Amino acid sequence: MTRTTGAAPDRAAPAAGETPGGGGRAQVYLHAGQIAVAAEPTAIVTVLGSCVAVCLHDPVARVGGMNHFLLPLHVEREQSARFGTVAVPQLVEAVVRAGARRASLVAKVFGGASVIGAFRGARNLGDENVQLALRLLDEARIPVLDRDVGGARGRKLIFHVDDGAAWVRQL
């Protein structure tokens, strides 16, 4: 696992005795199309391919959350968090309802691999998902402090909602 923190990616391994899911935190596994938010120490875990996870954190309130979406744009009849256009605004609203101040929110973005990129002419859903997430966060004026996106391999992600730390391991 590598840990990402701060404005620039920090790819150092966890310090001795430091474990990604440790520290007495509850642990939640997030499936595609889900959103998890917590106001107490919690490690949210997910596995991403072309899907994207947006992690939001309020460093003052120590509240945060994560979404995991599959496709960039929702269809008219379905307002599901499986779609980025639904999942990102829902995550922002949920984190604020849990006690975060919108003006204090910072983001990290992960995933968006081109796992089917070997097929010529295949649509690059991973890249579309990443671009949508970055655009929606920019429109919401939420700064993106870190990202680990693209490539051809999936990722396992662990995010601590209370301190904003994230660990990523390519699969």
Curated annotation (Swiss-Prot):
- State the UniProt keywords alphabetically: Chemotaxis, Hydrolase
Q: Which reaction does it catalyse?
A: L-glutaminyl-[protein] + H2O = L-glutamyl-[protein] + NH4(+)
Residue ranges annotated as compositionally biased, kind Low complexity, are 1-18
The record's Gene Ontology biological-process terms are:
chemotaxis
Annotated Gene Ontology MF terms?
protein-glutamine glutaminase activity
Family of the protein in this entry: Belongs to the CheD family.
Query: Which HAMAP family has this protein been placed in?
Result: CheD
The entry's protein name is Probable chemoreceptor glutamine deamidase CheD 1
This chain's source organism reads: Anaeromyxobacter dehalogenans (strain 2CP-C)
User: Which gene does this sequence derive from?
Assistant: cheD1
